[in-house]
Amino acid sequence: MTAEATVETRGFETEAKQLLHLMIHSLYSNKEIFLRELVSNASDAADKLRFEALKQPELLEQDSELKITIDFDKEAKTLSITDNGIGMNRDEVIANLGTIARSGTAQFMANLSGDQKKDSQLIGQFGVGFYSAFIVADKVEVLTRRAGSEPSEGVRWVSEGEAEYSIENIEKAARGTTIILHLKKDQEEFADGWRLRSIIKKYSDHISLPVEMPKEAAPGEDKEEKAEVEYEVINTAKALWARSRSDVTDEEYKEFYKHVSHDYTDPLSWSHNRVEGKLDYTSLIYIPSKAPFDMYNREKPRGVKLYVQRTFIMDDAEQFLPLYLRFIKGVVDSNDLSLNVSREILQQDPNIDSMRSALTKRVLDMLEKMAKKEPEKYATFWKEFGEVLKEGPAEDFANKEKIAKLLRFATTHKNTNEQDQSLDAYIERMKEGQDKIYYVVAENFNTAKNSPHLEVFRKKGIEVLLLSNRIDDWLMGHLMEYDGKQFQDVGKGSLDLGKLDSEEDKKEQEKVEEAMAPFVERMKAALAEQVEEVRITHRLTESPACLVVGEHDMGAQMRRLLEAAGQAVPESKPIIEINPTHPLVQKLDQEQDEDRFKDLSHILFDQASLAEGGSLKDPAAYVSRLNKLLLELSN
């Protein structure tokens, strides 16, 4: 069979063209990273071949010594990176090189700000990979053949990084991939041996595969006399996680993080640990400093890289960490698992549960240590990943208390939107006799801060957590207590401040309730269709009325979220609490006209609904009643 000679020209998609152009210009200030990306890809290709060759040894084609080779030609101004890894067939070339656009691209494009520094970090999270070659090259050639295919099934892909690329079949004896960069006029430094060596040592020394380059001629040695090029390995070529911690520098740890995560920023923290005993494994886990743009997509691939006895098995092994820690990057290398391990086997292996439990505890311990010793760094973590960590109490019962210790909240202590108060700090400031942790949930921070439910708490100097994120109501549904203190939603059920109310206060409340009983019955009749109950409040000191939900009913904020998502919500009516000391209520109590009493009661109910961020079921009726009242007042 001979190679197909036809050259096919194909166009990049519009979105892909924009992204390619943006990448080239946004990353120009840090252009040498292109080599790190290409070497990293070559290493991944070798890992994939090793894995597939476990079941199909013939894929190695009598060439089991996997390596990466870098060549350059100063005169031709070219640089080539060659690996003898898995390679690609024609369809894979089109899928991997011809299409940048993929799931999440539109969201990624929408997040771009025009700020070059910020955008370059975002581009790094998206995964530049191969396309970074166009930062320094005005033309890129890819010659590749998939392991196990015929030499005639080689593929040549060529592009100048503009609107299109060409692809054709070629004869290629060796499996694997060669990328040839035709360097731009002002990028000739990347055809210099010493410059390339320094970049490899800086960014890719940790690559477990040997990276080789032509040996530099010794001083006085004539290059022309050599019959063939001699190569030498220029990196350490040992898996970084397999080295002793004392032998690895911080810079090496940071560069390895960028290799496994394809991130451009340094990690916040990392932990390198060897476990021996019943289970034998090494882990190197990282906490990133920036959240990926698609972090809230719970379906996207996640997890650590899994190796067995230094042999790559899979990317995104999600079985080793729970979903709420999906932002963690790193490597797990086990000596106990089978080389033929699959995702299905991982789900059934009890040893994986033990490793998952230990790794989860390690991450939570890292965060606890950071929060205690480096609060500023933890504040950075919380801003990026706090909302995801809030998923933890619902997913991880065993570590609920540890996760709760890491949560941060806005509270009435500072009255700002900054989520920087821990539950431990709240408990330290609790009033004498206080046995609950109080919180309010609202649609946004201002609604929470100004909630009428807080009035008695402000009067008594009791701190309240101000919760206003979409996940908060759901979080508190799974976080019943912390450090022996129960959580209490100040907008739910009856308010009992326990020892924080004096006996005199309680007796006074009983007397008022008895005196206002006829008024309560009258209002209950007026609002029978809208409310479950009318009662005298202990919460309000300034507002005339507020709405609360039953102790076991769904919170108002959760109800609004579910309704907005089009989900069925169980029917329930709120409770209206009336402040008997407010002039409006006292005036209403004296109203003799029952129709007017009913109208004013409805206005009071609707205003209470608006005050807590709710919406009116019948806005037109509210406006009509209000206009009627205003007209009466003006007359």
Curated annotation (Swiss-Prot):
Pfam families given for it? HATPase_c_3, HSP90
Gene3D superfamilies registered for this protein in UniProt: 3.30.230.80, 3.40.50.11260, Heat shock protein 90, C-terminal domain, Histidine kinase-like ATPase, C-terminal domain
Going by the UniProt record, its keywords in alphabetical order are:
ATP-binding, Chaperone, Cytoplasm, Nucleotide-binding, Stress response
Write out the ranges of the annotated region (B).
Answer: 344-560
- The organism's superkingdom is given as Bacteria
Query: Which InterPro entries does the entry link to?
Result: HATPase_C_sf, Heat_shock_protein_90_CS, HSP90_C, Hsp90_fam, Hsp90_N, Ribosomal_Su5_D2-typ_SF
- Quick one: where's region A? 1-343
Q: List the disulfide bonds.
A: none
Location of region: C:
561-635
Q: GO CC: one term?
A: cytoplasm
- What GO molecular functions are on record for this protein? ATP binding; ATP hydrolysis activity; ATP-dependent protein folding chaperone; unfolded protein binding
Q: Spell out the subcellular localization from the entry.
A: Cytoplasm
Family of the protein in this entry:
Belongs to the heat shock protein 90 family.
Summary of subunit composition and partner proteins: Homodimer.
Q: Describe the task this protein carries out.
A: Molecular chaperone. Has ATPase activity.
Full protein name = Chaperone protein HtpG
Organism taxonomic ancestry: Bacteria, Pseudomonadati, Pseudomonadota, Gammaproteobacteria, Cellvibrionales
Instruction: Name the gene.
Output: htpG
